[in-house]
Amino acid sequence: ADTTTDIVDLQLKWNGGANSGTVTIELYPDSAPIHVENFKLLVQNGDYDGTVFHRVIDDFMIQGGDFTNGDGTGGHAAKWFGYCNGDNGVSEADCQQDRYTIPDEADNGLDHEPCTISMAKTSAPHTGGSQFFLIPSDSTPTWLDGVHTVFGEVTSGCNHVTAISGVETGSNDRPVQNVELVSATFVGSETKPWYEFW
């Protein structure tokens, strides 16, 4: 368990705005420092505000965070982290911003348990940018462990994640009615006293 965590609130709307709710996420900077820094920067930049969850699969996960294209083909890291679409042999000057990615931290011992947040990427290593996915309460996709990086957990509102995972979808697992991430807000950091870990 991490001694210091960062708290982010996601305001969500789905079913044509008929349903709404807040999902609170506790990020783990000790376990996944680069993922947390990147996610926090994207939140603080307002990049996630007004985006959609473009890929929703019941009993599995809901995926969003493509703030450039809104369909899973776009998004990128908040700043230069040394990787250009997974390649760390390219200089920042030779990499377009829309190809900025972050290194995997998937060996951090955190598993894809219900109500966790993990980073989306291609099948190639170190290709996470801004897309992320939330795991509903009825899903434990263990085959992602050690491949995708878990960097936090949903501490409140996982019922909303689970409800959204069951919405009607069309081609490419895209919801028929938009599932909107209205706003993402960095609430602050919390430090837990050491004795809570014993």
Where is each model-derived feature located?
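Cyclophilin-like peptidyl-prolyl cis-trans isomerases
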Residues: 1-198
